[in-house]
A protein has these predicted regions:
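Histidine-dependent nucleotide/RNA phosphoesterase domain, centered on the 2H-phosphoesterase fold
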Residues: 1-179
């Protein structure tokens, strides 16, 4: 049986993707593997490798898990180094803690039998690029990336996605609308 690499995401509106891609141009010379604009998203839950035969059941369970959720807002406020500024791994677009997103994460993970902390606040982020560690460490002067950018978006659905080609291509398997 073939395995698929599956995750649940919140899509980013194209207008926000465009704005983010315009912002990161100033850092293009850094040793960073930048994400393609079309792949920008918020990961709700990484499910992992599963047999393709169980994908329809996963999609159905996630649809059921999110069926009672109302659309909600997420506020973003900065582009910064993360998760630790002293030893960064990524450059990300960071949001403010969001209880509703934490509940959504919990509902998805509980319905799939994954561990989840109860109603944790969830700080959303969008990975913009992954730092190439060896080249980064050789930089004579490390950049201080902390750019304020206030953007709010509405979450009205989640999608079950398949990642192919080492994360170079994402395929939507199911869109699950919120109420």
């Amino acid at each position: 049986m073939q395995k698929k690499k599956i995750f649940v995401e919140i899509g980013i509106p194209s207008s926000i993707k465009k704005r983010l891609m315009q912002k990161i141009v100033q850092w293009k010379e850094l040793p960073v593997k930048w994400m393609k604009g079309e792949n920008l998203h918020i990961t709700v839950s990484f499910i992992g490798y599963v047999d393709e035969s169980v994908v329809p059941e996963i999609c159905q369970k996630i649809n059921e898990a999110v069926a009672d959720f109302e659309a909600f807002e997420i506020a973003f406020d900065s582009i910064e180094l993360g998760p630790n500024v002293d030893d960064p791994k990524i450059i990300w677009f960071c949001g403010k803690s969001n209880k509703e997103l934490g509940k959504l994460n919990e509902a998805v993970e509980q319905t799939l039998g994954m561990r989840s902390q109860k109603h944790k606040e969830y700080r959303p982020h969008v990975t913009l690029g992954r730092i190439r560690k060896l080249k980064w460490e050789k930089l004579s002067e490390k950049p201080n990336i902390n750019e304020k950018i206030n953007i709010t978006m509405t979450v009205d659905s989640v999608s079950v996605m398949e990642s192919k080609g080492g994360g170079a291509e994402y395929i939507s398997l199911e869109e699950c609308p919120l109420v």
